[in-house]
Design a protein with these regions (language model features):
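Bilobed periplasmic-binding protein-like "clamshell/Venus-flytrap" ligand-binding domains
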Residues: 34, 150, 477-493
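Surface-exposed intrinsically disordered loops and tails
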Residues: 493-502
Length: 504
């Protein structure tokens, strides 16, 4: 199972854009075109991916980066544990990002053979470009020399790109020339991050070909009918994250950003090819199930937003999933069935022979019915959740959200104000006001009809004539949350598992 970072579903790419190794999976397996992450930040999404649990259950509400950020508990039952109990040798290579340390205790999480510095892969500028190749080489070497010959095995690989888009344009040499003072300021700030690298702001070393000539269809969204946190987060991210200033009127800098995002996919695809070369050399395709997905997407200019953040737009939440299962999937097939990250762990466990009915922590539905019937129905609704203010100043607005999407209508409620930690684990102080159980009127609301408005420009929740409908959807979501997460979810600790709680 290969997991990229910050990769959205591929329909935004120009026709003919060369990603041959992803295309190899598409041509030889089943593509899921309506597959969603559960949470927009990296660590909460990865916790769902490897446990099959929702954020409200695994407790990872923020990126596992600093001492106060939550991390995945050693007591969590992961795919590593489930498959080990089934007789599998379970190994992990690359980015984990679920424990706030350079050397996570992967054996406690059910995985062997991990090596490296996880902290270096969390996402500073250029980390995907620098480290995806050695991670892929580790994985290829494992396939050639380490994998067992006398038992089944499961290898999970966490690559970093296209996450480097987080640092566009300040990682581009042409931007350094444009604004040398800003570049020097960012370099000085990043020099204080002792995360195992000699240079925390390297120049992107490759030429970026120009493919894009048009901005996203929803680029001109002014966000004034959207929850306040969308505007606030962008302002504070640009202030504190310092990825480079992008003038809204400078069309070219946004188009170059799309070109760069595509280029990062290409570099990552070459590294996936290194892993596939090892599979070719060891004749592994005939009896190996191969899965590719990502943790979340990236806005890359859609709604004039950058990165992933406290929202549930398609560009961030809809992500790739390709499965090649010899004898089970049909080459070149696709399904638009509504599916979600929480389903993948259940599917992997089932494919490995685990009796998923005896794994109560697996909360998703198996995707295997779609292997033979791409029109099969798996679920009625996917659920979204995130509770991280990220940057100073964001905690002053309703930054947390929970949402549901039924394939046509997407409804999200925004709550919060107060509490939380920043991106390096420093608490903002105070407690969350207007929490999960806050009154309808203490929320911001979103409602989109994606059949009529596929680019999510018209927030129907702002229409006074739909107030009763929004109240009804709010009540439906709250009832679904209680039924799915448990009614005591509203009292569950916002801190999740603090980074110093994992002690064996």
């Amino acid at each position: 199972m290969i997991v990229s970072d910050q990769e959205r579903q591929r329909d935004w790419l120009p026709t003919g854009y060369p990603l041959p190794n992803r295309q190899r999976l598409i041509d030889n397996g089943l593509e899921f075109t309506n597959y969603y992450t559960h949470s927009s930040p990296c660590s909460p999404s990865r916790a769902t991916l490897f446990t099959g649990q929702y954020m409200a259950e695994h407790g990872v509400t923020e990126n596992s980066t600093g001492p106060s950020n939550p991390e995945l508990s050693y007591t969590a039952r992961t795919l590593g544990h489930m498959l080990r109990d089934q007789g599998y040798y379970t190994a992990f290579k690359g980015k984990w990002h679920l424990e706030a340390t350079p050397t996570p205790n992967m054996e406690a999480y059910g995985f062997s053979d991990w090596e490296g510095n996880d902290q270096a892969w969390w996402g500073l500028a250029g980390t995907g470009t620098e480290y995806d190749e050695p991670i892929a080489r580790q994985s290829a070497d494992w396939l050639r020399t380490t994998r067992p010959s006398d038992q089944p095995w499961f290898l999970a690989v966490g690559l970093v790109n296209p996450h480097d888009i987080m640092w566009y344009p300040v990682d581009q040499p042409w931007y350094w020339e444009r604004d040398p003072e800003y570049y020097a300021q960012v370099r000085d700030r990043l020099a204080g991050r002792d995360w195992g690298r000699k240079d925390n702001l390297p120049a992107f070393p490759f030429e970026v070909e120009r493919w894009f000539t048009e901005l996203p269809a929803n680029f001109d969204d002014d966000l004034w009918t959207k929850p306040e946190v969308h505007r606030r987060w962008m302002t504070q991210m640009e202030k504190w994250g310092m990825p480079g200033v992008m003038d809204r009127a400078d069309t070219d800098i946004w188009l170059r950003g799309l070109d760069y995002y595509a280029k990062l996919h290409q570099l990552n695809d070459e590294c996936i090819g290194m892993i596939f070369d090892a599979m070719d050399d060891t004749d592994s395709w005939r009896d190996t199930i191969v899965i590719f997905t990502s943790d979340h997407g990236d806005q890359c200019g859609s709604h004039r937003l950058r990165s992933k953040g406290p929202w549930n737009y398609q560009e961030t939440m809809r992500i790739p999933l390709y499965i090649v299962a010899p004898g089970l999937t049909t080459p070149g097939t696709s399904t638009d069935a509504l599916t979600c990250h929480v389903d993948l762990a259940t599917t992997v466990a089932e494919l490995a022979g685990v009796d998923v009915s005896n794994e109560p922590t697996l909360r998703g539905d198996s995707l295997t019915p779609l292997f033979s019937d791409q029109g099969a129905h798996v679920r009625d609704t996917v659920l979204f959740g995130q509770e991280w203010p990220w940057y100073s100043g964001v905690e002053h607005v309703r930054y947390a959200s929970s949402g549901m999407f039924d394939g046509r209508y997407k409804y999200c409620r925004y709550y919060g104000v107060g509490g939380g930690n920043n991106t390096v684990g420093v608490p903002f102080g105070g407690e969350m006001q207007f929490g999960r159980d806050a009154h309808f009127d203490d929320h911001d609301h979103e409602l989109y009809d994606l059949q009529e408005d596929p680019h999510e420009m018209v927030n129907l929740a702002m229409d006074p004539a739909r107030r009763d409908e929004v109240r009804r959807r709010f009540a439906e979501l709250r009832a679904l949350e209680d039924a799915t997460y448990g009614a005591d979810w509203v009292n569950w600790s916002m801190a999740g598992n603090a980074a110093d709680d994992n002690v064996l």
